[in-house]
Amino acid sequence: MSNISSQSNDQDESRLNVLIIDDNEQITKMISSFLDMIDHECTVVNEGKEGLELIKTNQYDSIVLDLAMPEVDGYEILDTIKNEDPSQLRKIIILTASNVSIESIRKFKELGVASCLQKPVDIDQLLSKIQDTTG
């Protein structure tokens, strides 16, 4: 009986809680479907303001963040986190549809962001980056 309980606890410990903040519904569906398939918990929001509130009130293992969103964009979210809880920055994987300069990537790294990936995102690469944020 204790083996079953132990296995369940191991599964719970390996299950990641991921927040996806992106206004592109096609991308969020693809990422969340994949994460659900491999038994990770996934919260999806399409607005930066809502995502920022969730970051402030919940604990996530990893945060996938789009930079270009209407109203509250990824840059504003990064700035708020930097000022309010910089330890959260190491959990963030930035997604961007535009070409990101080497200088911007360097600035993200200096800020403490885990990674920056360009869309269309390679799901295996994203999963690897998500797992890196928890290690």
Predicted features along the sequence, with ranges:
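Two-component/phosphorelay signaling modules centered on CheY-like receiver
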Residues: E25-T43, L111
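Hydrophobic/aromatic residues positioned on beta-strands within the core alpha/beta folds
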Residues: L95-T96
